[in-house]
């Protein structure tokens, strides 16, 4: 678990965290988390006290659209190592056989 400061107007690379489940708690600021739902990008705007869960292998990126203030988030992962796999673009995970999304 660790605390991360996201600089004003920062945008991360598109990435996923491999087999790691990622839990994010927003301490301050209004970071946004961007995913792809198979039709286009989906943006989740957050506020202090919000919680975001990112399942394993789900491509996403983080953004702090605030031009002046950093965002502070606490990140907990289900693996000991911090896995980050950078991607050229966001994409939706294919449906699993038998129904349901990954």
Name each region found by the language model.
Residues 1-5, 23, 43, 51-53, ...:
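Conserved hydrophobic/aromatic beta-strand scaffold that supports enzyme active sites
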Residues 7-10, 49, 55-57:
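Tight coil/turn sites that cap or link beta-strands
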Residues 28-29, 36-38, 56-59, 76-79:
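Beta-hairpin (beta-strand-turn-beta-strand) motif
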Residues 13-15, 33-34, 54, 60-67:
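Short beta-strand His + acidic residue motifs that chelate non-heme Fe in jelly-roll/DSBH
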């Amino acid at each position: 678990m660790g605390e991360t400061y996201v600089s004003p107007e920062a945008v991360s690379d598109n990435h996923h965290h491999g087999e790691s489940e990622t839990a994010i708690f927003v301490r301050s600021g209004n970071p946004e988390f961007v995913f792809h739902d198979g039709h286009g990008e989906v943006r989740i705007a957050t506020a202090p006290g919000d919680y975001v869960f990112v399942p394993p292998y789900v491509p996403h990126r983080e953004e702090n659209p605030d031009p002046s203030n950093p965002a502070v988030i606490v990140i907990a992962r289900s693996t000991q190592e911090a896995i980050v796999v950078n991607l050229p673009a966001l994409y939706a995970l294919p449906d699993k056989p038998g129904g349901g999304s990954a």
